[in-house]
From Swiss-Prot:
HAMAP family: Anti_adapt_IraM. It is found in: Cytoplasm. GO terms for cellular component: cytoplasm. Involved in the stabilization of the sigma stress factor RpoS. It comes from the Bacteria. GO terms for biological process: cellular response to starvation. InterPro entries: Anti-adapter_IraM, PmrD_sf. Keywords: Cytoplasm, Stress response. Belongs to the IraM/RssC family. The keyword DNA-binding does not apply. This is Anti-adapter protein IraM.
Length: 120
């Protein structure tokens, strides 16, 4: 089944991404996953056994949960993610003050801060 990505939120404290997806049959879900790829709004995705096809390219994705879309939960996810990449307009540098658990920044932001005496 083909899905359209409505919105995506990244959680730097957990490394988990959340995407609101919408089917042609008017079903809205929230996908909780970990991946090295960002699913931008407007992307067309098709689930497969070992990942997801995003705009006709296969990417590995670990899906943790799929739930019915809940607007109250979605608002809470957006307000509490604290990832500067989730904001508009986006800056060039990451201002997240703690260690980011996202392995590859999907927004291409650079980290120029010290955390626990380690450059991140």
């Amino acid at each position: 089944m083909e899905w359209k990505v409505v919105d995506t939120v990244i959680s730097p404290s957990t490394g988990v991404s959340f995407s609101c997806i919408h089917s042609l049959k008017n079903l809205r879900l929230t996908l909780w996953y970990q991946a090295d790829v960002y699913m931008p709004p407007g992307s067309i995705i098709i689930p497969f056994n070992k990942g997801v096809l995003i705009n006709d390219k296969l990417y590995p994705v670990t899906v943790y949960n799929v739930t019915r879309f809940n607007p109250v939960l979605w608002k809470s996810l957006k307000e509490n993610s604290h990832c500067p990449g989730n904001c508009n307009p986006k800056s060039e540098a990451c201002s997240y003050p703690f260690e980011c658990l996202v392995s590859v920044c999907p927004f291409g932001l650079t980290r120029n801060i010290q955390i626990d005496n380690k450059k991140v």
